[in-house]
Structure formats: structure tokens, C-alpha cells
Amino acid sequence: MSKVCVIGDGGWGTALAMLLLENGNDVTIWGPFADYIDEMRETRKNPRYLAGVTLPDALKLEADMAKAVAEAEVVVLAIPSHFYDKICVQLADKLPKGCDVVSVSKGFCEKTRKRLTRTASKLLGIEDVVALSGPSHAEEVSRGIPTAVVAASNDVERVLRIQKLFSNKRFRVYTSTDTIGVELGGAIKNVLALAVGMSDGLGFGDNSRAALITRGLAEMARLGCVLGGN
């Protein structure tokens, strides 16, 4: 059993916290607003971000960041990209020494325009942050619907620890050393998804959808290589 703190009380952070708890870990969610954390604790619900889901009694909720991360062996960053740098700055002097840090957010830091693991690594003063990304809706993970993601890091031992921490029969975690490729894929796929949705909304057919997907994937791969991915 590992002591885990999930930074972020959004839908994705909550779904992953429930998964980690189910896997036998001691899990605490940190959220920035004490009133809402109190409401979640009392009602065992997260109506703003993960409606219709009951939070397990064993899932801890905390608005004091120092208390939430105290003695944590793993810290999971489930922070919206536009708040990413601000929360990392708050966390920097509270992060337990030697803990594993996992970024599960998608996108780029709004302020620096850099990848999120790179932003976290710099602001937290640590060498390696694991990226966990893939096609994964929070509401489906919370309901135990089969899901596959990728954990990426240059530190093979660390990424294997994270794979073991998150994996179960319904949540498959693959591993990679291509952190850049995994993060870029997780962020840019949303642009492609929007384009396909626009095509559908305009009433275009399967031909247009297929063209957008195939050419979009090719462009994603080329961009990934240019930016240093494998």
C-alpha cells in the first residue's frame, strides 16, 4: 500500500483517486476551496465535476495542501493546464523528499507554453515527472469501464512503479520512455477531435471524417518528431 495525494478535485483527479483507493492505497484528494471540500466530505459527492458518483468513505479530502501531501509517497498532479504553474509553485516547498510525481493533466502550461511535466519538473525542483496520458474519460474510469493509458518517463524503475500503482483488470497501463510523444499526443489529440466534431456538425460524411483522422494523425506524428518525441 502506498500513501498517495491527488492534487486537484476535478473529475479526472477524483476518478483516479477512486481507482487508486480501489487498488489498496491510502488516498487523499486536495482541492483549493475549503467550502467545496467540506461539501464533498459531508455528502460523498463531487457534483461540479463528477456528478452521479458516490465517493468511498475511505477517500480522504483535504483543503490544506501541507496536510494533504504530508508523508505522501506518490503525488498525482491532476490540475487544469491554466492553473498548472500556480499550483506547482504552491506545492514546491511542501513536496515530500523522494516521492514520485505523476502528471495526469493534458495540454500545455498556459504561462510558459511548455509541456506540463517539464513545467512541473522545473517549478518543483525535481529531475523526473512521470506523464500518464491516453484516451480516458473520467466518468468512464469512475464506473470501471475498461481503459488503457500510457505512463512515460526516462526512469524505467519509476515508470514501472507507477504502472503497478495504477493498474488493475479494468485500467491497463502501458509504459514508455517517450515522455514527449506521450504528452504531445495527449494534448494535440483534442485539437483533432474538435476538427472531427466540426466536420460532423457541418453534415460531412465518413469520407471527410476519415480524411481528417488519417491526415491529423500523420501531422501529429511529424510534429512529435520535430519536438523531440520518438
Protein language model features and the residues they cover:
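Hydrophobic anchor at the start of a short beta-strand
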Residues: 4, 27, 127-129, 173
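Internal alpha-helical scaffold of NAD(P)-dependent oxidoreductase catalytic cores
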Residues: 83, 94, 119, 123-127, ...
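Electropositive phosphate-/nucleotide-binding environments in soluble metabolic enzymes
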Residues: 10, 14, 30, 34, ...
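Fold-independent oxyanion-binding glycine-rich loops
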Residues: 9, 32, 64, 79, ...
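NAD(P)+-binding Rossmann beta1-loop-alpha1 motif at the extreme N-terminus of oxidoreductases
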Residues: 1-53, 60-63, 90
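Rossmann-like NAD(P)(H) cofactor-binding subdomain of soluble oxidoreductases
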Residues: 55, 61-70, 74-146, 162
